[in-house]
Amino acid sequence: YGQRRHPKKLTPLAYKQFIPNVAEKTLGASGRYEGKITRNSERFKELTPNYNPDIIFKDEENTVMNQWPGVKLRVTEGWDEDGHHFEESLHYEGRAVDITTSDRDKSKYGTLSRLAVEAGF
């Protein structure tokens, strides 16, 4: 089956750097806004829960643990319905997530951002 690929060096993202290099709400980044999902909407059933024990959800990925042993991915915001985001926020559709690390070490955020990009977010 060929040779094993060598892992490429991950370059941390800079503060306020986007991949793709466009704002979150633009078509190139996330597609069209499809409308807010509420608990009573049909689309709510399409959301997929994540029960990964390596992720700490603020409301009580293995790549984070590989990068920093003992540190977990911390999701501070995912799907939301409380109305404190801008009107067409992707949080209301379950297409946006805010993340940190369990140790809240801001020096890791650039690399964390790069890991998210490499994972397809």
UniProtKB/Swiss-Prot annotation:
Residue positions binding Ca(2+) 1: 60-61, 76-77
InterPro entries: Hedgehog (IPR001657), Hedgehog_sig/DD-Pept_Zn-bd_sf (IPR009045), Hedgehog_Signaling (IPR050387), Hedgehog_signalling_dom (IPR000320)
GO cellular component term of the entry, any: plasma membrane
Localization: Secreted; Cell membrane
SUPFAM superfamilies: Hedgehog/DD-peptidase
Binding of Zn(2+), residues: 91, 98
Keywords from the named record: Autocatalytic cleavage, Calcium, Cell membrane, Developmental protein, Hydrolase, Lipoprotein, Membrane, Metal-binding, Palmitate, Protease, Secreted, Zinc
Post-translational modification: The C-terminal domain displays an autoproteolysis activity and a cholesterol transferase activity. Both activities result in the cleavage of the full-length protein and covalent attachment of a cholesterol moiety to the C-terminal of the newly generated N-terminal fragment (N-product). The N-product is the active species in both local and long-range signaling, whereas the C-product has no signaling activity. Cholesterylation is required for N-product targeting to lipid rafts and multimerization.
Gene Ontology terms, MF aspect: calcium ion binding; patched binding; peptidase activity
Binding, Ca(2+) 2: 61, 77, 80, 82
Homology family: Belongs to the hedgehog family.
PANTHER family documented for this protein: HEDGEHOG, SONIC HEDGEHOG PROTEIN
Domain comment in the entry: The sonic hedgehog protein N-product binds calcium and zinc ions; this stabilizes the protein fold and is essential for protein-protein interactions mediated by this domain.
Protein name stated in the entry: Sonic hedgehog protein
Protein encoded by which gene: shh
